[in-house]
Amino acid sequence: MTQAFQKVSAIRGMNDVLPGPSAQWERFEEIVRAWLQGYGYRNVRTPILEQTRLFTRGIGEVTDIVEKEMYTFTDALNGESLTMRPEMTAGVVRAAIEHNMLYERPHRVYSIGPVFRHERPQRGRYRQFHQIDVEALGFAGPDIDAELIVMLGRLWNTLGLADIRLELNSLGQPAERAAHRAALIEYLEKHVDILDEDGKRRLYTNPLRVLDTKNPALQEMANAAPRLFDFLGEASRAHFDGVCQRLDDAGIGYSLNPRLVRGLDYYNLTVFEWVTDRLGSQGTVCGGGRYDGLIELLGGKPAPAVGFAIGVERLLDLWEQSAGQQTPPECEVYVVHQGEGAQRLAARVGEDLRDAGLSVIVHAGAASFKSQFKRADASGARVAVILGDDEVATKTASVKYLRADAAGEGAQDKVALATLASVLKSKG
């Protein structure tokens, strides 16, 4: 006797997106692509798998992502260490270097797709999640930093989102961070007895991240620590002032957060996050900043760059809360039929209506009119096209309007098949 196969479930933290929610995703992505194209950004697509050394070099060996969160394995064919991308920026920069994109001119590019981190799943934090990654490669001034932030403000408005606030900081340049790092280590050494395990681990490897602690017991100590902003030179301050002035000009509100450092080592100068209190502990909807050294660090010709990433699942959650999401209909027209001749005619009518640009579902199989109408209503279609023996004989169709916005809910007309498409289009 064959043993019953135990059904397979999705991996914890890696979620299926079923037809209803998937329609929301498609609508959301249409809005996002139109928004990005409105600012001149063009799509790039990079592989999910990259060489591990791209991320250890680009993100930083002592970051949480590299130390604890990457899905890494050895390729059995050549022994190469490969990693499923935990973020997109490093891969986009690798592609720009490999294909000599920056030798001719700067580029505005974006990617949308899945990324992977080995984390403990919870609301807003998954092992496979999706990002909108936006990069301005080859741009140096504070104007582009501000434009990216203003762009995001426009997206929130388009989606009807409120309660998202902007936090800003400057990480300065490497020499300024080195001076601050020395002062910070000296300060933290005086408080080593109260540091938690994460703090002690990061004390000499990544002391800035100690200040980003979520441990309430360390907040007072972190608040009194030396501030990086006090170590910034004239050029770094001028760049940050330029960003703030342009945000003021655009009417974008913000707060300065001296402890905002981001979780990736490649940032310098401007860093920012858009955060909300409406998603529980996972309140960061979008984060980004400037990374002028990353292109050179990964083997390219030195070039400035700035970008951001949006967490799609978190933003969709926020959008749903704001009632911005309405389930799109499965089709505009649902064709119901009774009898073999009507079923065959329905297939031809469906194709004719699609030729006219309408989305159409032709009921599959045999069923009563009652059950077909029930299915038509559930589909969200605005009209039902009804075909029976009489319609076949007279080359007509009965049209029943199912929605209040479709020429009168419940009304029914008789329409010649030759003019059916134009009638439905005119009443759309």
From Swiss-Prot:
Domain of life of the organism in this record? Bacteria
EC top class, in one word?
A: ligase
Instruction: Name the keywords, alphabetized.
Output: Aminoacyl-tRNA synthetase, ATP-binding, Cytoplasm, Ligase, Nucleotide-binding, Protein biosynthesis
Provide the protein's localization: Cytoplasm
**What PROSITE patterns does the record point to?**
AA_TRNA_LIGASE_II (PS50862)
Tell me, what's a Pfam family for it?
A: tRNA-synt_His
Known InterPro entries for this protein?
aa-tRNA-synth_II (IPR006195), aa-tRNA-synth_II/BPL/LPL (IPR045864), Anticodon-bd (IPR004154), Anticodon-bd_dom_sf (IPR036621), His-tRNA-ligase (IPR015807), HisRS-like_core (IPR041715), HisRS/HisZ (IPR004516), HisRS_anticodon (IPR033656)
EC numbers for this chain: 6.1.1.21
Q: Which reaction does it catalyse?
A: tRNA(His) + L-histidine + ATP = L-histidyl-tRNA(His) + AMP + diphosphate + H(+)
One GO BP annotation here?
histidyl-tRNA aminoacylation
Gene3D superfamilies annotated for this entry? Anticodon-binding domain, Bira Bifunctional Protein, Domain 2
- GO (cellular component) term, any one: cytoplasm
Which GO molecular function annotation, any one, does this entry have? ATP binding
Q: Where are the transmembrane segments?
A: none
Q: Which cysteines are joined by disulfide bonds?
A: none
Note the subunit structure: Homodimer.
Recorded family membership:
Belongs to the class-II aminoacyl-tRNA synthetase family.
Q: What's the protein here called?
A: Histidine--tRNA ligase
The lineage, from the top, is: Bacteria, Pseudomonadati, Pseudomonadota, Betaproteobacteria, Burkholderiales
